[in-house]
Structures are given as structure tokens and as C-alpha cells.
Amino acid sequence: MNVFKKLTALLLSSAAVFGCLTGCRASNDPNTLYIDAFEGGYGVKWLYALGEEFEKQNEGITVKINETSDDSTFSTMLTSGRSTADIVFERYPFWDRIFRPTVVGSTTYDPILEDLTDIYNAKIPGEDVTIAEKLPEDVRAYYETDGKYYHFNWAAGMMGLLYNKNVWSSSWKLPRTTDELISLANTIKKAGKVPFVYSLKDSYWGIYVVWAAQYEGLEAMAAYDEGYAPNGKRYVPELALYPGFEKALKVLEVLLKDENGYCHSRSKEVDFTMAQNMFLEGDAVMQANGDWIESEMRANFAEGETDIEFMKMPVISSIVDKCPSITGTEEEKEAKLCAVVDYVDGADGATLPDGVTQQDVEYIRSARSMMQTIGQDHSAYIPVYSTKKDIAKKFFQFMASDEGIEIYVKASGGYRTMFEYDYSKSELQNGISSFMKSTNALFEQSSHYFMPMKNKIFSLTGMQFMENGLVDVEVYLSASNPKDYKSASEIFLANYKNLEKEWTNYLNTAQIGK
């Protein structure tokens, strides 16, 4: 498209990016919409396609896109007042920009992002629905702050456990529970294959938060997200002591423990791309990853050369502790749990074990339906000092329209946003890989779990899940040197102790009174 210009920022330093953006866009043409975009696993073809159609429908408007694999520069440019973009697509909403004013020179912006509430609540042109109504309720609520909206979604980002069907034995069954996942890992080892491969530098084992949520339940996790501890007290270090957090860590401990041999021996040395390719090549049977692996397959493998799929997230076996009607020995409780999972999955001939209550069935049903998503964090914004906010908002409305959604899906090769739409339409399925078809189908069937970490106690302090004053939990759990190893329980306790020691500072930073 001849009116499009690609301002490449790949591999440039922050200083060079600053120079390009401030120099290349010095004219700030009133009819040109400048967009900065992160170019990662989802690519930016969809953005160019949307921009091209937007130009056609808005005579006289030109869209120029600056794409970069280093979106860390976006935040610096925004808060320094040097951003020349009218729209920025990045990977995290950075709530401090909303909760705190930003001073640029002699001007104070509170907040520094443009208020999008008007287009969130207005009918999308040509449709009888609003942007707010097109978003799942949990995502809409995540973006809402004191009745206003400042962020716009641009990806779905499902994560979970993938398995390679090219090396999968027909005698193996997909695990219904974490105990079955561990048993499967043993079976795979006995068959002379490697159960898992990952990169310790960037492991994506963060999916273990789903096991924590399965155990605790959505109500308890919502309380945690609002700063409540298990004892009901708010803004206390005991916030980190939900039992399910330790239970989830214990599952991860078994999977990663060096002496168990469930993970490829090179997992601690390879980078993420290498680990991903090793999985796709069949060097390991399973991997924790996200739907963006599709792009890696397209880039490095011929069509039909790979065959992978997400499994439903296994239910944490210790969930039986929360289900009083599931009784018996540990083996009997696991068997009953598996039977209930079959029942909620709708497996052929599945029946409920005697005595299991409907309340416990629904608790397990909720747990089984959870799949992690990080798409809610893939958000775009308009700098409040942009001089083309009306055009930028119009672009957002177009992107959220049915037409815009279809353009996004087709141009991206099957990826989707969080906006609700009939993604199963045949015209969208044509040309999409079998992996993306199965991924989108599972996405539709699942409840999408994410940990907001939006409350000020998290977003203004940098508080992490189970890693406060610690390095990544995978480093401890996979350590072969006993001096470097920490068990799940040790991590759980150390995280709490570190929070307890610094809690006054956390409260002060978050501006929360006792």
C-alpha cells in the first residue's frame, strides 16, 4: 500500500528510537495517524491491514506505523512527553499511569492517557452494540477505573500446556488432574522420551497460577486481587498466605525438580526460541507456552510438518481438600476427582460417584474450565497530549467493529482479540491452521483466567506473585545444586517473610493507610 510507511525500529537502541520518532515525525501532519506497535508473536500484519482499510474509508487520512520488538521505549517516551504517536499498542497497561499524575516539564497530566469512556459507551458506527458490551465482563471490568476507560484490547493471548501429537503415543491419555500429569511424565520417561522442555530464562511456567486459582476458587482469587488475605484482613502481608498458592507451587516442584528428570537437560541453558523449536521438533512431548507459537511454526516449519495442540488444563489434585463430599483414601479421592472431571467434560458414559454433591461438582467444573490468558494486558492507548485523538478513537471503533475483527483474524492467520464475535464463521476458518482452529475452539469453551494485579498494593509497589525478594521460582525448583534449591514450601514462606519485612514500605508506596 503506497501511502503506508514502515518506520522500522527493530534492533535500535532507545536513543536511536527517540531520534527517529522525534525527527521522522517532526511535522506532525494533522491528517496522519501515527501508530507505535509492539511486534512480537502476533506480528503486525493485522495492524497494516486495518490501517489500509481505515484509509480507504476515511479519505485524506494516512496511517503510518512504527513497529518494534522493544516496546520498553514506549513508556519512556510517553512519560517524558516525547511520544509522537497517536496510538500505542503495547503488552501491559501500567496502571501507575492512571493512579498517579505524570509531570512533563511544567505540565501535570492526570492521567497521561486519553479517556476512552465516550467510545466505550457509544454504539460502534454501523452496529447496535458498544465497545464495552463486546468485551467479556471480566476484561471490561479490568479496564474500568472509577467508571472510566483508558485502554483498548488488541489480543487474546491464551496460555497453557501444549502437547506434540507427532511424538504422542496412542496409548497415552490426556491428563485430567495434576496427579495424572505427573503419572504421564513418568510414562513418557519410561518410553524413552522427554516429558517437557522449557527455557529457564523465559519459561512460561507461570501457568501454575491457574492451579492456584483452581484450588482457591474465583471468589477467593477476586478477594486476593483486591488486597484481602485469607483471614479477611485487607492490606496485610498475610495476603500471600492463601494455601492454594503453596499447593500450586508443589505441583510445579514435582515437574521441575532436577532429580525427577521430567525436563530436557538443556532447559536451563537454551533461550525461549530454541526451547520452542526443540518442542516443535519433537525433542520433548509437552511444553508450557502460548498461542503465539503459531507464528514460530509458520516461520520455521513447512505446513503440515508440525502437529501440536493445547490440552485442557489438568485440575489440581489437591482440590479434593476443598470438596468435602469427595472422601476416602488419597487414591479413592483421586479416582472420584477424575470421575467428576469426566462428568463435567461430558465424556461418554461418565457418571458421578455416589455421594458427590452438586456444590462440589460446580467447584470442579469451574476449575476445569480455566485457561490462562494474558490478552487483557495487550492493550493500546492514546497519549493525552496527542493532537489527533478523534481520529485515533475512530480507529479503535473500527478495530472493534465486526468488519475490523474479521480483518484482524484473516490478516493475523487466525489470532483473535478479546472482543466477542462469531469466530467460527466459515469465512474466517478458511486458511487457518488446524492448531489455530483447535486453539480458538478451546478458547471459546473455556473461562479465561488472569490475575489482574491492578489494585494499588500490586500495581504501585511492584509486588509479585510468589517472587517478592526472590528470583523466578523455576530457578529454585529446578536447581541441581542443593545450596541453590528451595522447595515449594520454602519459597512460599520466604515470599511471605520478605513481604512482612517490607510491608510498611509497600503501604507507603501504594499510599494506603493502615
Give the residues covered by each predicted segment.
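Conserved C-terminal helix/tail region of periplasmic/extracytoplasmic solute-binding proteins
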Residues: 405-406, 417-514
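Extracytoplasmic "Venus flytrap"/periplasmic binding protein-like
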Residues: 53, 57-134, 166-176, 278
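Hinge/lid segment of periplasmic solute-binding proteins
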Residues: 95-158, 173, 182, 330-365
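Short, well-ordered beta-strand elements
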Residues: 29-41, 61-66, 86-87, 196
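Bilobed periplasmic-binding protein/Venus flytrap-like ligand-binding cleft at the lobe interface
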Residues: 284-285, 341-414
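Helix-loop-helix "hinge/cap" segment bordering the ligand-binding cleft or interdomain interface
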Residues: 56, 123, 143-209, 217-270, ...
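Glycine-centered hinge/linker elements that transmit conformational signals in sensory
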Residues: 185-188, 225-269, 299, 308-361
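Short, low-complexity disordered leader/linker segments with a strong preference
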Residues: 1-34, 56, 501-514
